[in-house]
Design a protein with these regions (language model features):
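Histone-fold recognition with a strong bias for associated Lys/Arg-rich disordered tails
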Residues: 1-155
Length: 155
């Protein structure tokens, strides 16, 4: 993985979270984008059928198709690289996701950053991806409750 991040080791991530970031990098690369953005991360989390993200969003009455379509449109509008190789590093907003996700480990008494932590961190942001989730009806309180239920094994 070529990903660069500041102030955090990628070894603090679960294997699934590492895979998501690799897929986000690939999506950014194939889209011709300069950096890996929060839109790429959320889009790959939504598209990963082994990820609990779709369940967590639906548990909070979020229209997953709406979010997915808006993400696709947002990715198409991201700046394209005209020369050189695109998508080698996380954008500032995407790097901040990792920092916030690490901070949320204490809330759930976890050791590694999972995709659930990444979703909370995206929601806590102030960028367009966070706004999209909030506009779709996702709240941090509702998300934490759904994650807690998921960890208990109730659906």
């Amino acid at each position: 993985m070529i990903l660069e991040t500041k102030k955090m080791s990628l070894q603090n991530l679960t294997i699934k979270s590492q895979e998501i970031l690799q897929q986000a990098q690939q999506l950014a690369f194939t889209s011709g984008n300069a950096n890996i953005e929060t839109e790429h991360v959320l889009k790959t989390m939504l598209n990963d059928k082994d990820s609990p993200i779709e369940y967590l969003l639906k548990k909070n009455n979020v229209n997953v198709n709406y979010v997915d379509e808006k993400l696709e449109a947002a990715i198409q509008k991201l700046p394209k690289v005209s020369s050189g190789e695109p998508a080698q590093a996380l954008s500032r907003d995407a790097n901040n996701i990792l920092l916030r996700a690490t901070a949320s480990l204490k809330t759930f008494k976890d050791e590694f950053v999972s995709v659930e932590h990444l979703l909370i961190a995206i929601l806590q942001g102030s960028d367009n991806t966070a706004k999209l989730l909030k506009d779709a009806g996702l709240t941090e309180k509702g998300l934490v409750a759904a994650i807690t239920d998921l960890k208990k094994g109730s659906t």
